[in-house]
Structures are given as structure tokens and as C-alpha cells.
Amino acid sequence: MTRYKAIISYDGSGFYGYQVQPNTRTVQAEIEKALTKMHKGKTVRITASGRTDTGVHAKGQVIHFDSELDITAEKFQKALQVMTPFDISFLTVEEVPDDFHARFGTVGKEYRYVVKRTKIFDPFSRDFALHYPYELDISKMKLASKRLIGEHDFTSFCSARTERDSKVRTLYSIDFYEEDDETLVIAFQGNGFLYNMVRILTGTLLDAGQGRISPDDISKALLARDRQKLISKTAPPQGLYLWRVDYE
């Protein structure tokens, strides 16, 4: 039995999230269906670095699976690329030690959120970015982001449905890239992220950019440890990308 690590990308707009769910199309289900077919009907399960919600995309999701087939990693990659749908891509496949674990072995992740700042709605980017036709002061967003860097209890910045007992996470950096006059990309790097955390952080920073909240408001929300104390809404899923997963 050999363990394989794969880096995959996918367009999340056609999936009901990553994780297998009854009677819905998911990323995990499509990949496991292809692997099961390759193994002549024997069920093969995959493990990912984490789940993504409906409409959320991935540029660098990491999965692992075990196989007893006597084929190379390169042939696995080519076969899976052919056997999975057009909205999933296998960027790399490689053999890894048996103790590699896509989920429990992570030491950091990067998410990016894409904001289209056009006055007129662009129908061609509707599934891949948030349309935000309002004025934004990027300098205010950068100031606000500094209050979020470091180790904090992010209870105020995650969904009440978060299953983790500890809400303490470390944000290494928040960077802002203005790719052109119309596109703003916010990149979040940290040791881990809670359910809806990046989308709530994005909504908070957008509010800061409009002057609705101040850096002090963010500090108070962190200390409150209560999602209800934060007025910012959760940004919609279509602008969010799991960009990279890091391992030791």
C-alpha cells in the first residue's frame, strides 16, 4: 500500500462544498468516484487539508489517499485528470511516507479573497469575486488589519457553528494586492482558520475601509469573544480561495 499526496485546484461554484453529502455534488465525492473506478469498484477514501464551503474555490488544496495499484504517481495524475470533471485539476501527485497526513500535518495555510471594485456589475466574474461598488480606503484597511495579526481568540470572527473547542489561532500576515484599478486581493496567512473566519475577517476589513468601524472596534471585538458583538457581515463565498497549504 502506497500513500499519495496530491495538490488540486477546483472551481467551487459547481459544488455543494468539498465534503461528501447525500444527494449533492461535492469535490470529495467526484474524486473518490474516480479513484473507486480505477480500483475496480473498491472504495478509496481521500483526506483533505480542510473543508471548503459551497461556492468556495481552491488553488492549492492538498489531499492524500492510499492505493495498492502498481502505477507511478505521474500516471495517477494523468488518470485522475482525465477521470474527474472539468472543474477539478490535479496539479501534482507524488508518493509520500505513510505518516504524511493532509489534515493533521499542516503548519499553515493561505487564503485569498478577491474583490471587484467596479461600479457596474461584471457578470463574468460573479462566481469568482465579490462585486463591491463602494469606495474603499485601503490605508484604513491596512491599519485595521494590524489589530488582527498575532495569536488571538477569534471567537468573534468565526461562525457560531464552529466545531473547534479552542478558537485561538495565529495570523501571520494580512496583505493587500491591488492587481489593477478594479481588483483588490486580500491574502491571509495563519497557522489555521476557523469556520467562516476568513469571510468574516474580510467583511470586517471592508467595513474598516468604508469607515464604519475603527481599529479600536476590532480590538474590542477580539476581547469580547462574542460574534454578536461584531457588526460586520460575513463576506459571500464566491470571492474566497484556499490558496496554499504548508507542511514541515
Swiss-Prot record:
Keyword DNA repair attributed: no
A UniProt-annotated Pfam family: PseudoU_synth_1
Catalytic activity: uridine(38/39/40) in tRNA = pseudouridine(38/39/40) in tRNA
Residues that coordinate or bind substrate: Y111
Annotated signal peptide: none
Keywords of this entry: Isomerase, tRNA processing
Active site: D53
EC number(s) given by UniProt: 5.4.99.12
The keyword Plastid is assigned to this record: no
Gene Ontology molecular function: RNA binding; tRNA pseudouridine(38-40) synthase activity
An individual GO BP term: tRNA pseudouridine synthesis
Role: Formation of pseudouridine at positions 38, 39 and 40 in the anticodon stem and loop of transfer RNAs.
Family assignment from sequence similarity: Belongs to the tRNA pseudouridine synthase TruA family.
PANTHER family, per the entry: PSEUDOURIDYLATE SYNTHASE, TRNA PSEUDOURIDINE SYNTHASE-LIKE 1
Assembly with partners or alone: Homodimer.
Name of the protein: tRNA pseudouridine synthase A
Organism of derivation: Listeria monocytogenes serotype 4a (strain HCC23)
Gene: truA
